[in-house]
Curated annotation (Swiss-Prot):
UniProt xrefs under Gene3D superfamilies: Ribosomal protein L6, alpha-beta domain (3.90.930.12)
Function as written in the Swiss-Prot or TrEMBL entry: It is located near the subunit interface in the base of the L7/L12 stalk, and near the tRNA binding site of the peptidyltransferase center. This protein binds to the 23S rRNA, and is important in its secondary structure.
Entry-linked Pfam families: Ribosomal_L6
GO cellular component assignments: cytosolic large ribosomal subunit
NCBIfam families associated with the record: L6_bact (TIGR03654)
Top-level taxonomic group: Bacteria
A biological-process GO annotation: cytoplasmic translation
Keyword Ribosomal protein part of the UniProt annotation: yes
Annotated protein name in UniProt: Large ribosomal subunit protein uL6
InterPro entries tied to this protein: Ribosomal_uL6-like (IPR000702), Ribosomal_uL6-like_a/b-dom_sf (IPR036789), Ribosomal_uL6_a/b-dom (IPR020040), Ribosomal_uL6_bac-type (IPR019906)
Family: Belongs to the universal ribosomal protein uL6 family.
Assembly mode: Part of the 50S ribosomal subunit.
HAMAP family, A to Z: Ribosomal_uL6_B
Amino acid sequence: MSRIGKQPIAVPSGVTVNAQDGVFKVKGPKGELTVPYNTELTVRQDGDQLLVERPSDAQKHRALHGLTRTLVANAVKGVSDGYTINLELRGVGFRAKLTGKALEMNIGYSHPVIIEPPAGVTFAVPEPTRIDVSGIDKQLVGQVAANVRKVRKPDAYHGKGVRFVGEQIALKAGKAGATGGKGKK
């Protein structure tokens, strides 16, 4: 039995679930999500819990069991609590602001970088050097946050750029002879 797949999924109050024809629909206070799943697996509700069951111990079913359970659990958590990923800007003059719903960043290029959020994702800028990416779809929020980070990845020598809050950047040592002073005669 899959260690992940056999765990029940708690359904909070205010969240309704419906699984039929290979599509799992979950509706909650923050919105509505649909998750497709393999019809060989069954998703059933038992009181305030959801259970994902597989028909056999075949390799394919074992692989899909844990995956489906995690996708369904992410959808339930997304519509009840939502997901937020925090990013920070490091560098002299690096700052961000909201222009309407779009994120505008000055991150060392000769022009500001503007990123439009896809449907279901919102940006927030609590400080000029911090960006919050939030939404109900965990995969989409993570992908958008990765796309924002990709615009200016942290530099290997100084750590300047866009990074996740708490991310440790392994900095490289500079050139050994870069201490200054007079050159060779």
